[in-house]
C-alpha cells in the first residue's frame, strides 16, 4: 500500500534534458539577420549581415551539425526560405540587400563548403528572357543541369543579362566560396530599376505549380509561376503591378515612393493554406484563387486573384490577375509595419493575419468575405470605379449588382455590351466569371482594338476595387492589439497549425500567444536570452 501511495504521490524521474539541442555556436562572425527551417524541422539555414549562409542538419540525437557555409550575397541577407520538402528537398531561397533573389541547389556528393555554392558544374548555361509588361522588366537568369537526379534539382552557373549595372565585389570568405568567384546559384533574378526587398514562395501540390512573389523598393510586386517542378528555368511572369498609392504629386498611374533618407519597410507573404476558406468559396471566391498580403510602410493590403483575359502578341489568353480585396489604411499602425504573417488553418471559417509594428504592438486581424446578397451599401459604400469615371459616371445599382453576382451567366452579347461600355485602361485584361470564360475569349478576339492596349503606367496601377465580375469584397477586422513587448516588434510568425503566434521585439524576447474562446489572442509563454558569466575553470 505504501508503495502504491509513493507511486501516486511521487512521479517517476524523467530526463530533464530537451530532445534537441539549440544552435548556441552558429559560427557567424557578424549579426544573424535571417533564420529559416525546412518543413520537417531538421534543417536550419542562417544568414548574416556579411552575406554568408550557414546550413545545419539535425541528427537523430538532436545535435545540430554544420552542413555547409558559403558567401551568397555581397551584403546582408534579408530573407531566407526553404522550398517545400515534398517537391524541392534541397533548395534554399535567399534575398540580399543588393536586391538579388537566388535559389541554391544542394549537391550531396560535393565537399563541405561547396554543396550549395557549386551544386552545378557540368551543365550548359541557360538564360530565359522575361516578358515586358511594365517599364522595368525583371531580368531572370537561370541555370539547369541536363541530367536531373531524383529529389535534387541541380543547375550550373547562372549568367547575367547583357550590360548589367555595376555591382560591388563581394567580400572574400575564408573556408567558403565567394559570390563572385565560386558561388553559383541555380536561379537568379533582379530588378534593374529598384532592388527587391521581400519575397514569398508557395507550392500547390494538386496542380504541381510553384509561385514566386517579389516586392521591390519602389512598390512593384512581381509574381512568377512555374508548372514544371523538375525545371527551374520554367518560371514565367504571371502578373505585375504596383502596391503603392498614387499621390497628387506623382499623378495617376505613378507610385508615391518614399523620400531619400526615409526609413522604409516592405513585406509580402502568400496565403499558406492549400485551399481557399470555405466561407470565401461560398461568397464567390474561386477555388484556385491565390491570396497575398503586402505590408508597405504603415499600410497592409490583401490581394486575391480572379480569372481574366489578356492580349499577348495579338492573341487573347486566359490568365489570373490580382485585385485589391481589403486594406488596412494608413493611421491604424502608428509606425512602420516590420513584418506580416498569414495564419495556416483556415478551417475555422475565416483567415487570420498578424502584423509586427514599430509602435510596439502586435495586431491580429480577421479576414472575412462579404456575401453579395447580404452586403450593406451604407456600411460599405461603393467606390466609383476609375473606369466608370472616365465614361462620365457610375453604372446604375441594378446593372452593377447583376454584373457583380458570381452566379450570373455571361452570354456573348452581354460581354460585348460590357466591353463597349468599359472602354478603359484594363480592357486587355477583361475580367470575367468562370462560366463565361469561353464567350469572353471569343468576344475579346473579335473586338480587340488598339485603344485597349495598356501602357506601362496603367499596367502598374494599384489594382484598386472596380466592382467587376470576379471580385469579392473582403473585410479586415482588428480582433487583438498586443503590447506585451513594450518595444518595437520586428518579426511575427504562426506555427504550422495556426494555433500559436510568435513575435520577437527589441528586448530580445520571444513571446507566444494563443487564441482564447472568444476569438481574441493573449500571451501564453515567454522565452528570453539571459547572459550569465561563466566561472573560470580551476
UniProtKB/Swiss-Prot annotation:
Listed name of the protein: Nucleoporin SEH1
Similarity comment text for this entry: Belongs to the WD repeat SEC13 family.
Parts forming coiled coils: none
Entry's localization field: Nucleus, Nuclear pore complex; Nucleus membrane
Biased composition (Low complexity): 129-149
Start and stop residues of the WD repeats: 27-66, 72-114, 191-234, 260-313, 332-375, 484-523
Role, per record: Functions as a component of the nuclear pore complex (NPC). NPC components, collectively referred to as nucleoporins (NUPs), can play the role of both NPC structural components and of docking or interaction partners for transiently associated nuclear transport factors. Involved in nuclear poly(A)+ RNA export and NPC biogenesis.
Superkingdom, taxonomy of origin: Eukaryota
A Pfam family matched in the record: WD40
Keyword Endoplasmic reticulum: no
Signal peptide: none
Protein keywords: Membrane, mRNA transport, Nuclear pore complex, Nucleus, Protein transport, Repeat, Translocation, Transport, WD repeat
Amino acid at each position: 500500500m505504501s508503495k502504491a501511495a509513493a507511486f501516486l504521490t511521487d512521479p517517476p524521474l524523467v530526463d530533464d534534458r530537451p530532445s534537441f539541442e539549440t544552435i548556441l555556436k552558429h559560427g557567424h562572425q557578424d549579426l544573424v539577420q535571417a533564420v529559416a527551417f525546412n518543413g520537417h524541422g531538421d534543417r536550419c539555414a542562417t544568414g548574416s549581415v556579411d552575406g554568408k549562409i550557414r546550413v545545419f542538419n539535425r541528427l537523430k540525437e538532436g545535435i545540430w551539425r554544420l552542413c555547409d557555409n558559403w558567401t551568397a550575397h555581397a551584403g546582408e541577407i534579408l530573407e531566407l526560405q526553404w522550398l517545400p520538402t515534398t517537391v524541392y528537398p534541397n533548395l534554399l531561397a535567399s534575398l540580399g540587400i543588393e536586391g538579388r533573389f537566388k535559389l541554391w541547389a544542394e549537391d550531396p556528393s560535393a565537399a563541405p563548403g561547396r554543396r550549395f555554392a557549386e551544386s552545378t558544374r557540368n551543365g550548359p548555361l541557360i538564360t530565359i528572357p522575361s516578358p515586358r509588361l511594365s517599364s522595368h522588366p525583371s531580368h531572370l537568369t537561370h541555370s539547369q543541369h541536363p541530367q536531373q537526379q531524383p529529389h535534387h534539382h541541380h543547375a550550373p552557373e547562372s549568367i547575367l543579362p547583357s550590360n548589367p549595372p555595376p555591382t560591388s565585389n563581394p567580400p572574400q570568405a575564408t573556408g567558403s566560396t565567394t559570390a563572385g568567384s565560386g558561388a553559383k546559384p541555380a536561379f537568379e533574378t533582379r530588378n534593374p530599376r529598384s532592388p527587391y526587398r521581400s519575397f514569398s514562395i508557395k507550392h500547390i501540390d494538386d496542380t504541381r505549380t510553384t509561385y514566386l512573389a517579389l516586392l521591390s523598393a519602389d512598390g512593384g510586386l512581381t509574381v512568377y509561376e512555374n508548372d514544371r517542378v523538375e525545371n527551374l528555368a520554367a518560371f514565367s511572369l504571371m502578373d505585375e503591378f504596383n502596391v503603392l498609392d498614387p499621390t497628387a504629386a506623382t499623378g495617376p498611374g505613378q507610385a508615391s515612393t518614399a523620400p531619400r533618407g526615409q526609413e522604409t519597410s516592405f513585406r509580402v507573404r502568400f496565403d499558406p493554406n492549400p485551399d481557399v476558406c470555405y466561407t470565401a468559396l461560398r461568397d464567390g471566391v474561386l477555388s484556385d484563387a491565390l491570396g497575398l498580403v503586402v505590408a508597405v510602410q504603415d499600410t497592409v493590403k490583401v490581394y486575391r486573384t480572379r480569372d481574366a483575359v489578356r492580349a499577348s502578341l495579338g492573341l487573347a489568353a486566359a490568365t489570373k490577375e490580382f485585385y485589391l480585396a481589403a486594406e488596412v489604411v494608413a493611421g491604424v499602425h502608428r509606425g512602420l509595419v516590420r513584418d506580416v504573417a498569414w495564419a495556416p488553418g483556415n478551417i475555422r471559417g475565416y483567415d487570420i493575419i498578424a502584423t509586427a509594428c514599430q509602435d510596439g504592438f502586435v495586431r491580429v486581424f480577421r479576414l472575412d468575405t462579404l456575401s453579395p446578397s447580404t452586403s450593406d451599401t451604407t456600411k460599405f459604400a461603393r467606390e466609383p470605379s476609375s473606369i466608370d469615371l472616365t465614361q462620365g459616371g457610375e453604372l446604375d445599382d441594378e446593372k452593377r449588382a447583376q454584373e457583380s453576382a458570381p452566379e450570373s451567366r455571361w452570354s456573348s452579347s452581354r460581354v460585348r455590351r460590357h466591353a463597349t461600355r468599359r472602354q478603359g485602361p484594363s480592357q486587355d485584361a477583361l475580367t470575367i466569371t468562370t462560366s463565361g470564360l469561353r464567350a469572353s475569349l471569343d468576344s475579346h478576339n473579335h473586338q480587340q482594338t488598339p485603344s485597349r492596349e495598356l501602357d506601362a503606367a496603367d499596367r502598374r496601377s494599384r489594382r484598386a476595387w472596380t466592382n467587376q465580375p470576379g471580385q469579392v469584397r473582403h473585410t479586415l477586422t482588428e480582433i487583438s492589439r498586443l503590447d506585451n513587448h513594450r518595444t518595437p516588434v520586428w518579426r511575427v510568425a504562426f506555427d504550422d497549425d495556426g494555433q500559436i503566434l510568435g513575435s520577437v521585439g527589441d528586448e530580445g524576447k520571444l513571446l507566444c500567444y494563443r487564441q482564447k474562446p472568444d476569438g481574441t489572442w493573449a500571451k501564453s509563454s515567454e522565452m528570453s536570452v539571459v547572459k550569465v558569466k561563466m566561472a573560470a575553470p580551476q
